[in-house]
């Protein structure tokens, strides 16, 4: 465990998360060992979880660039830190199935209690057909009501598919063809997957 506050590494040698994320799909720091500092916004290290936690830059420390994410996933079995803590983390940057994360963690230092970053407000549909890269790993708040349209994986994976409006199979209301295909694409960009992290 950690003492109440361990500040030896805090505030030193850190790279802003947004620089690691960058505006593109692949981090320029991939394969390099870096140190970052931020707030644990979700801890998913419990049994059956994602084997890590989400770390986001504190409000007031962001680059204010709407094209870059301010958060990373930290893949680790280390138990240091908990939800809401500000931590200093050192590890290797890796792109894992399109997700920028830190792995091979060499240290996690608790720097005290942090304040959770404010969630970013988003609306559906996704403008480019899928959740934007600049929201990767970040806290979000979806405007408006959402409808559960699929709960097949709820018991096994804790997943729900949510949509901005109720949805039906396109061919239930349209003849197979371009019209049904267009509606299917429209429905796809009006969905998101909610996972409980377990």
PLM features per residue range, with description:
Residues 2-198:
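Extended non-catalytic accessory segments flanking core domains
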